[in-house]
């Protein structure tokens, strides 16, 4: 093939492979003119040059930062895992102890990163948290100690990380509303991560600590374009309970709960009580009912304790005179209400008396007043923290030492308010009025709506949230309850109430074996082998005695107006929850 023929063939191939020229259409759908095309081409070249320039500048900035001396090196970063290799003995400060009075002082503290905000590349704000105390801290770039690299790193610290911060306290010129320390802030000199976050948080602690009112208000404002707060439901919180327990509200709740236990123990120890520890597994159910957890105990059946009732009484028969216990109580009740759990903490006591069971009832009244006054005087700060999320009115204590009602007098108060109406067989009652009726108005136990109504009546009429109802009907009390000697339809028993909610049930116990067996049979409880040793304890002599059992979580719930009893338990148990 000649050279000319080759050139012709190549031209032919190029023609076949040549792509059609791009046709650019204008807004009118027609091809652009040459003038318009030229203008578009210039704009494209200009845009391309801009991108190339920005890329060069970014690369140059990166190189400058890499070559820039970090004069804060060693003042920030992740600390190695603490394996207790050294103990320098430095002095640490609590956030609660910091105020404007410390202006100019250097402090060292360990805290969690509650919130953070990077402002440009020269400033980072933190809210540092210890339990329910928070303080604002900031790292600001300067020429000598705080570098841009340090501030940038500060902005990368994950929320809930535990940090070691050293800084100077500065009096704030304005009130810092977002922190509990409102008149001072910390200007950071050094900051290290002690314990980083190694998984994504299921929710923010800040979100879990908001009140229902705050959430609703944000949802209403969202319609106007504002962002709304995240609603963290109770199940999500309980599924991730360790994180949830970090909220300031929960920290305050469980401080108060611990304070109640301490006050209970202090008062009883100062009145010659002995702390006891009874078995939580037994061969018989203490109440003689079916609401017990049955367990396999080697080759026989056992039960988880419903209460320490039987053992408290046996210890009284053993001359222990005054005993108390703080321990777990198990109830196999398939109830999913806001006020029931299958495991809770019981504050139980039992004591011998000399003449009348009212000696014990009066003592328990004084015990409760001591507990309530302890909360009011020593835990006012914690109560205020809880009220930010769960608003409540002050708990009203009676002007006198006690407010008591006979059961039939409480029934009378309810009748006057339109409750306790006789339910006639076959009578149709409106659904919204069902709780106004009962089969036996004089002797039926109070329903939950009736208890609440009575609480409101007593509050308005007697100006108290704390009161006692005495002489409950024998038919609604356990077999070991002493009948009223004057009217056996009633019993020597009592319930204590807070805001119309029962928090303690107690009574004089039967300490005569024959009467005890008689009552057991009358109520359908078999005095079998499982209860025989309990009965025998009274056959060898036992002083008259009375006592009661307090539900710890209920006291916390009702005092703080919590919407659900699960909020008063660190790791609640109910029919649907056995973890965590």
From Swiss-Prot:
Transmembrane segments: none annotated. It is an enzyme of class 6 (ligase). The gene is dps1. HAMAP family: Asp_tRNA_synth_type2. One of its GO terms (molecular function) is aspartate-tRNA ligase activity. The modification Phosphoserine is found at residues 282, 307. Belongs to the class-II aminoacyl-tRNA synthetase family. Type 2 subfamily. It is found in: Cytoplasm. The lineage of its organism: Eukaryota, Fungi, Dikarya, Ascomycota, Taphrinomycotina. Coiled coil: none annotated. NCBIfam families: aspS_nondisc, PRK05159.1. ATP binds at residues 331-333, 339-341, 502, 551-554. Residues 309-312 are annotated as: Aspartate. GO terms for biological process: aspartyl-tRNA aminoacylation; cytoplasmic translation. One of its GO terms (cellular component) is aminoacyl-tRNA synthetase multienzyme complex. It comes from Schizosaccharomyces pombe (strain 972 / ATCC 24843) (Fission yeast). This is Aspartate--tRNA ligase, cytoplasmic. Keywords: Aminoacyl-tRNA synthetase, ATP-binding, Cytoplasm, Ligase, Nucleotide-binding, Phosphoprotein, Protein biosynthesis. It holds the Pfam family tRNA_anti-codon. L-aspartate binds at residues 287, 331, 505, 509. It catalyses: tRNA(Asp) + L-aspartate + ATP = L-aspartyl-tRNA(Asp) + AMP + diphosphate.
């Amino acid at each position: 093939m000649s050279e000319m023929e080759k050139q012709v063939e190549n031209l032919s191939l190029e023609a076949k492979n040549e792509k059609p020229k791009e046709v650019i259409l204008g807004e009118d759908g027609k091809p652009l003119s040459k003038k318009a095309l030229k203008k578009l081409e210039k704009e494209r070249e200009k845009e391309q040059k801009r991108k190339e320039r920005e890329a060069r500048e970014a690369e140059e900035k990166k190189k400058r930062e890499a070559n820039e001396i970090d004069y804060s090196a060693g003042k920030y970063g992740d600390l190695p895992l603490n394996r207790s290799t050294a103990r320098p003995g430095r002095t640490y400060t609590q956030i609660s102890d910091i105020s404007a009075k410390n202006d100019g002082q250097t402090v060292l503290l360990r805290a969690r990163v509650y919130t953070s905000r990077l402002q440009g590349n020269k400033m980072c704000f933190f809210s540092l948290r210890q339990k329910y105390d928070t303080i604002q801290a900031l790292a600001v770039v300067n020429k000598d100690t705080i570098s841009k690299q340090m501030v940038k790193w500060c902005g990368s610290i994950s929320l809930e990380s535990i940090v070691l911060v050293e800084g100077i306290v500065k009096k704030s010129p304005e009130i810092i509303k977002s922190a509990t320390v409102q008149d001072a802030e910390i200007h950071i000199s050094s900051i290290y991560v002690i314990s980083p976050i190694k998984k994504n948080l299921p929710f923010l602690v800040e979100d879990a600590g908001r009140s229902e009112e705050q959430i609703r208000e944000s949802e209403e404002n969202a319609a106007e374009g504002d962002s709304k707060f995240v609603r963290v439901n109770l199940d999500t919180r309980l599924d991730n309970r360790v994180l949830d327990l970090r909220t300031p509200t929960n920290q305050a709740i469980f401080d108060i709960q611990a304070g109640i236990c301490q006050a209970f123990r202090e008062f009883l120890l100062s009145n010659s009580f002995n702390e006891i520890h009874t078995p939580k597994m037994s061969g018989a159910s203490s109440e003689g009912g079916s609401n017990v957890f049955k367990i396999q105990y080697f080759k026989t059946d056992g039960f988880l304790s419903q209460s320490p009732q039987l053992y408290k009484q046996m210890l009284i028969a053993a001359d222990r005179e005054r005993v108390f216990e703080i321990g777990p109580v198990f109830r196999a009740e398939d109830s999913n209400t806001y006020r029931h759990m299958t495991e809770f903490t019981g504050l139980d006591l039992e004591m011998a008396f000399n003449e009348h069971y009212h000696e014990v009832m009066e003592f328990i009244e004084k015990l409760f007043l001591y507990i309530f006054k302890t909360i009011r005087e020593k835990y006012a700060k914690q109560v205020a923290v809880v009220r930010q999320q769960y608003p409540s009115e002050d708990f009203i204590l009676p002007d006198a030492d006690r407010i008591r009602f006979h059961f039939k007098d409480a029934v009378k108060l309810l009748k006057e308010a339109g409750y306790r109406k006789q339910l006639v067989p076959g009578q149709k009652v409106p659904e919204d009025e069902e709780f106004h009726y009962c089969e036996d108005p004089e002797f039926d136990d109070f329903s939950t709506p009736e208890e609440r109504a009575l609480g409101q009546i007593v509050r308005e009429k007697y100006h108290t949230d704390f009161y006692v109802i005495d002489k409950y009907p024998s038919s609604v009390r356990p077999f070991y309850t002493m009948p009223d000697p004057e009217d056996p339809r009633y019993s020597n028993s009592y319930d204590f109430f807070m805001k119309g909610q029962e928090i303690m049930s107690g009574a004089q116990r039967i300490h005569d074996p024959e009467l005890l067996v008689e009552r057991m049979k009358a109520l359908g409880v078999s005095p079998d082998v499982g209860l025989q040793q309990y009965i025998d304890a009274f056959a060898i002599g036992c002083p008259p005695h009375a006592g009661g059992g307090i539900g710890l979580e209920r006291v916390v719930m009702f005092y703080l107006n919590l919407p659900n009893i699960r909020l008063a338990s660190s790791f609640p148990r109910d029919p649907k929850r056995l973890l965590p």
